[in-house]
Each structure stands twice: as structure tokens, then as C-alpha cells.
């Protein structure tokens, strides 16, 4: 049989890898009808490109290329200073009398903590995040509404049709959401169900804010739920690279935390 060219072979190997995360030399030889030597060389080439890790007798996908969802507890310890800075910046934009939506995510939990510590503002908060709710529920100046629905323990969020139906009827002065990845003109998250809720909240807000730390730029995740050019503002930390600042400013306003 005529062998496919190298580029095609490498694509095929990556496709096979994406299915279960690991692959053996034998599977490659059987599938692509190539020699042991060629199979090994192909894996070496993909490893050099940073797309996989060679193992004894095969290879495995590098976890950075596979969207891995971390729990909100695990995420809490990541980039904490940056998240606090972002939350402070976002908090400063919330005015007395505002009705706001706060989505799930550790940066938004931080925003809830900032809001709780702030005196003299009466606001209304709607959230589908249990951690956010638990922070704000004993505040005397915040009218609080928790959206119920199907519970996702990994992020502490309520999602699904029940949450969507309730959200559709609501309007906000500002919506604050987070995401796992920002690439080109889109923002993405791991769960389509969470993405849908965030999409609805943004659609129903006069001002739309995305809170992401600078590690989220040029990353990929599973479900694209919004376009950057439909947002009013991205709030990020001051570690954002000049390249990312320039690239993503063509779509929307980027506000750097102090």
C-alpha cells in the first residue's frame, strides 16, 4: 500500500492519541502500516514539538493539550495574588444600587469576598455559584438570589434548564464571569452547561465583564461560550504580556489590575 506522507501520519497519530490519551508503537504500526523505526521517529518528532511524552513502548498525550478540569478547591491555590488584584479592580466598578450577576470560579469567589468587606453599598447579587452564595449570605447590605438547578460539585455551580429558565427573565446592570481559556475572539470553559449559563447572564447584562488571570490567554478549552468583541471589558492582572495585551485589545477593552 502507498504510505501516507509524514504530515498526514503525524496527524493520524495525534488523533489516535486524543481518543484515550495513550498509544503504543504496535498500535501505530498496525494502524498506519509503517515500520517500527518509522513509528518511533514519528513519535520523536511529535515529542520534539511538545505534543506528547514518550513512554516505554509508546507515548502519552501531554496534559496541557488535554482540557483537564480542576475542582474549585484545587484552583483556589493557583495564582491567588493575581486573583485578589483582579477582584479588587472589579469591585471598584460596582456602584451603589447595582444589580449584578456573579458566575462560578475562584476569581469570582474572591470578588464576593471583596464585596462582603465593603461598607455602605446596597446592591443586589444573583449567582449560580454556591461558594459565592455562602460568602455573601450573611451580608446585611446585599440582596442575594441563588439560582437553583442541577449541581456540579467540581465547580460548585448550579446549571441546566431550571437555572436557564430563571435566568432568562432577569436583567443586570453588570455581569461578571470567568473562563478557563481566551483564544482569538472567543472565551471557553470546560463544561458546556456552565458555558450556557454564563452566556445567558452576559446577554442579559448592560455591561459584560470577563475576569481572567493572565495565564488564561492563548489557551484552549472545550466549549466556546462567548466572543470577546461582545464583551465590554476584560479585567486581568498586571502580569499580562505586551503581546497578549496588544492581540486581545483589538477585540475589547482590557483593564489591568493595579
Predicted segment positions?
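HTH-adjacent hinge/linker in prokaryotic transcriptional regulators
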Residues: 2-12, 18-26, 31, 37, ...
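Conserved phosphate- and dinucleotide-binding cores of soluble alpha/beta proteins
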Residues: 5-15, 21-28, 33, 38, ...
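A general structural motif
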Residues: 97, 120-122, 205, 231
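Conserved SAM-binding loop
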Residues: 101, 125, 190
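Hydrophobic/small residue at the entry helix of a nucleotide-binding pocket
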Residues: 107
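Active-site signature of alpha/beta-hydrolase-fold catalytic machinery across serine-
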Residues: 110
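Catalytic core of membrane glycerolipid acyltransferases/transacylases, capturing the structured
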Residues: 114-134
Amino acid at each position: 500500500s502507498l504510505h501516507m506522507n509524514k504530515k498526514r501520519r503525524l496527524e493520524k497519530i495525534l488523533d489516535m492519541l486524543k481518543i484515550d490519551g495513550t498509544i503504543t508503537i504496535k498500535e501505530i504500526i498496525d494502524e498506519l502500516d509503517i515500520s517500527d523505526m518509522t513509528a518511533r521517529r514519528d513519535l520523536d518528532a511529535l515529542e520534539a514539538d511538545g505534543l506528547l511524552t514518550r513512554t516505554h513502548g509508546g507515548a502519552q498525550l501531554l496534559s496541557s493539550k488535554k482540557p483537564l478540569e480542576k475542582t474549585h478547591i484545587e484552583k483556589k491555590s493557583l495564582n491567588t495574588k493575581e486573583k485578589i488584584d483582579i477582584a479588587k479592580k472589579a469591585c471598584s466598578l460596582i456602584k451603589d444600587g447595582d444589580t449584578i450577576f456573579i458566575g462560578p470560579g475562584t476569581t469570582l469567589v474572591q470578588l464576593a469576598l471583596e464585596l462582603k468587606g465593603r461598607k455602605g453599598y446596597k446592591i443586589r447579587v444573583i449567582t449560580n455559584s454556591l461558594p459565592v452564595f455562602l460568602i455573601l449570605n450573611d451580608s446585611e447590605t446585599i440582596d442575594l438570589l441563588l439560582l437553583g438547578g442541577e449541581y456540579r460539585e467540581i465547580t460548585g455551580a448550579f446549571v441546566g434548564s431550571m437555572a436557564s429558565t430563571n435566568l432568562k427573565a432577569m436583567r443586570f446592570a453588570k455581569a461578571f464571569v470567568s473562563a478557563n481559556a481566551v483564544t482569538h475572539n472567543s472565551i471557553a470553559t470546560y463544561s458546556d452547561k456552565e458555558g450556557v449559563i454564563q452566556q445567558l447572564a452576559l446577554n442579559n447584562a448592560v455591561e459584560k465583564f470577563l475576569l481572567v488571570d493572565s495565564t488564561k490567554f492563548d489557551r484552549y478549552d472545550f466549549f466556546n461560550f462567548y466572543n470577546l468583541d461582545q464583551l465590554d471589558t476584560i479585567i486581568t492582572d498586571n502580569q499580562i504580556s505586551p503581546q497578549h495585551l496588544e492581540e486581545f485589545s483589538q477585540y475589547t477593552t482590557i483593564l489591568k489590575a493595579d
